[in-house]
Design a protein with these regions (language model features):
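Long, aromatic- and glycine/proline-rich binding clefts that accommodate carbohydrate-like moieties
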Residues: 306-310, 356-403, 410
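Extracytoplasmic/periplasmic substrate-recognition and gating elements
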Residues: 75, 251-257, 294-359
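Conserved N-terminal structural module of periplasmic/extracytoplasmic solute-binding proteins
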Residues: 2-120, 300, 315, 355, ...
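Glycine-centered hinge/linker elements that transmit conformational signals in sensory
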Residues: 188-189, 232-263
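Short, solvent-exposed loop/beta-turn-alpha elements that line the ligand-binding surface or hinge
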Residues: 133-142, 205-209, 224-244, 294-301, ...
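A structural signal for short loop-to-beta-strand junctions that line the ligand-binding cleft
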Residues: 99, 108-110, 138-173, 184, ...
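Conserved C-terminal helix/tail region of periplasmic/extracytoplasmic solute-binding proteins
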Residues: 2-3, 384-436
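Hinge/lid segment of periplasmic solute-binding proteins
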Residues: 116-165, 177, 184-186, 303-309, ...
Length: 436
C-alpha cells in the first residue's frame, strides 16, 4: 500500500489527539504548544534521577505517527519512558518554541524534532549535542542524504528520523515514457500540451520555500553544489549550473510551458490542476498519489492515466530531488542525555519504529524499509531518496532561502536582470555560513 496522507504538505490538520495504539504505555501524554509546561515539567528539569523519562518536542503535524513511535518505545522501555510535547504544525512556530526554551535555558525538552534544514543553526548556537560517535550506527542503515542533513561541517549533531522526496508525475495517455532529461521533458511536454490543449507543467512556483526547492532541484540536476564539502565557502557560481537552472525556468515561463499562474502556485494548486487533467507533467511530493488515483475518495480525471517517475537531470544520468523530513537531536540542556541519545538512535534504526512512519504516510529514513516493500512506487521513492540532495543545514539557511526567493523569483519572471540576481545569491550563500 502506498502513502495515504490526510493532507498535502501545506495543509492543516486537527490538533485533537488520536487514540494510542493498543497496548501502548499509558504514560504517553499528548499536549499542544502553548498549553502550559510539558509533561513531567511542573517542577522543572527534563527528568528525575529515580524515574528517568524524556520529553520529545516534535511537530504537531503527523501526530498519529509520532504517537505510535513513542508508544512503541514505551512498551519496550518501561523504565525509560518518553513523553511527547506536540509543537505547532507550522515550521516557524516550531522553531520559535524550541528557541524560546533553549534561549531561556528552561530545558524542558530533551529531544528536539528538527526540520532537516535547521541542523547547522542549532549546532552553531551550541543548542544540541554532538552525536558523531553514533555515526557508525546510522551510516549504511539510514539514507545517505538523510545523514547529510543531520550534520554540520562533517560532524553529526542529529540522527535521521523521517524523510521526503519528489516525484515527476506524467500523463500516460499523452507520454509514452518518462523523460530522462529536462530538455526532453520540455520538448515532449510542449508537444503533448499543444495537442491536448492543456498546460505543459505544474509545480511549486510561488515565492516561498517551494520555489527554492524547485530552483535547487534544477541547479543540482545541472551538477551544481551550493558549498564545498566542508561547508566553508560558497560554490554557487562555480560552473554554469546556477545560470542553467535559472535559464530553464525563465524559458519555461516565457514560452508558456509552465502553466498560467505557475508563479503563484503551491503544492495543492498543482495537484488540483493535474488531477483535473489540465497538465502533462507535475513536480510534487508523494502525498498526491492516492488523491490522483482515487484511492482517497476524491474524483480524478486522471485516475487511470498517470504514473510517477524520478525527476530528470540535464545530462540524463540519475535523478535529484530535494530532501524533506525531520531529524532528532539531543538538547544540551537535557538532564537525561543518555536516555535521549538512546531514543534518537532507536528511532533512526529500529525497523518497527521506521515501519510505523511508512504506515502513517511519512517516508522513513531507514533504507531496508523501502527494500522490503512490495509497492513499486514506494521502492522507487527509496531509490529517489538514495540520490536526493539535502538543502544545506547551514546556520543562515533561512536568510539564503529568502535571498533565492527575493532575487531569483523576479528574475525567472523577466522582471530582474539574472546576472546581478545570481551574484546576490552567491553573497547570501557566503553570509549563510557566518550568520550568528
Amino acid at each position: 500500500m502506498f502513502f495515504l496522507p490526510g493532507r498535502g504538505p501545506r495543509g492543516r490538520r486537527t490538533r485533537v489527539a488520536r487514540p494510542l495504539a493498543a497496548g501502548a504505555a499509558a504514560l504517553l501524554m499528548v499536549l499542544s504548544s502553548g498549553c502550559g509546561a510539558p509533561p513531567g515539567q511542573e517542577g522543572g528539569g527534563a527528568g528525575l534521577a529515580d524515574d528517568p523519562r524524556i520529553v520529545w518536542a516534535v511537530t504537531g503535524a503527523d501526530r498519529a505517527a509520532h504517537e505510535q513511535v513513542a508508544a512503541l518505545w514505551n512498551e519496550t522501555h518501561p523504565d525509560r519512558q518518553v513523553e511527547v510535547f506536540f509543537l505547532a504544525p507550522t515550521a516557524d512556530e516550531q522553531r520559535q518554541a524550541m528557541f524560546q526554551d533553549l534561549q531561556s535555558r528552561a530545558g524542558q525538552f530533551d529531544v528536539l524534532g528538527l526540520d532537516v534544514i535547521w541542523t547547522g543553526e542549532f549546532a552553531d548556537f551550541g543548542y544540541i549535542e554532538s552525536l558523531e560517535d553514533l555515526r557508525p550506527e546510522v551510516e549504511g542503515v539510514s539514507l545517505p542524504g538523510a545523514v547529510d542533513t543531520a550534520q554540520w561541517r562533517q560532524e553529526l549533531f542529529a540522527l535521521p528520523y523521517s524523510s521526503n522526496g519528489a516525484f515527476l508525475y506524467y500523463r500516460t495517455d499523452l507520454i509514452d515514457e518518462p523523460p530522462r532529461t529536462w530538455e526532453e521533458l520540455y520538448e515532449t511536454g510542449t508537444a503533448a500540451a499543444e495537442e491536448a490543449g492543456i498546460s505543459g507543467f505544474v509545480g511549486q512556483g510561488d515565492r516561498y520555500e517551494g520555489f527554492v526547492v524547485s530552483y535547487l532541484e534544477l541547479f543540482w540536476a545541472a551538477g551544481g553544489e551550493l558549498f564545498d564539502e566542508g561547508q566553508t565557502r560558497s560554490t554557487f557560481l562555480e560552473g554554469d549550473a546556477a545560470s542553467t537552472a535559472l535559464d530553464f525556468m525563465t524559458r519555461a515561463h516565457a514560452t508558456g510551458f509552465y502553466a498560467e499562474g505557475y508563479d503563484s502556485m503551491v503544492e495543492d494548486d498543482a495537484r488540483a490542476l493535474f488531477q483535473a487533467g489540465e497538465a502533462v507533467y507535475m513536480r510534487n511530493w508523494p502525498y498526491a498519489v492516492p488523491l490522483l488515483s482515487g484511492e482517497a475518495g476524491e474524483e480524478s480525471a486522471v485516475a487511470d492515466d498517470f504514473a510517477v517517475a524520478p525527476l530528470p537531470t540535464f545530462d540524463g544520468e540519475g535523478t535529484t530531488s530535494a530532501l524533506g523530513g525531520l531529524n532528532n537531536a539531543v538538547s544540551t540542556l537535557s538532564d537525561e542525555k543518555e536516555v535521549a541519545r538512546e531514543f534518537v538512535l532507536w528511532a533512526a534504526t529500529d525497523p518497527g519504529a521506521q515501519a510505523l512512519l511508512a504506515e502513517n504516510s511519512l517516508p522513513p529514513t531507514m533504507e531496508s524499509v523501502y527494500e522490503d516493500s512490495e509497492d513499486p512506487n514506494f521502492r522507487m521513492l527509496g531509490d529517489i531518496l538514495a540520490e536526493a540532495h539535502a538543502r544545506p543545514p547551514v546556520p543562515g539557511y533561512n536568510s539564503l532561502s529568502l535571498a533565492i526567493q527575493d532575487e531569483l523569483h523576479p528574475a525567472f519572471l523577466g522582471q530582474a536582470d539574472p546576472g546581478p540576481a545570481l551574484e546576490a545569491v552567491e553573497r547570501a550563500a557566503d553570509d549563510a555560513l557566518r550568520q550568528e
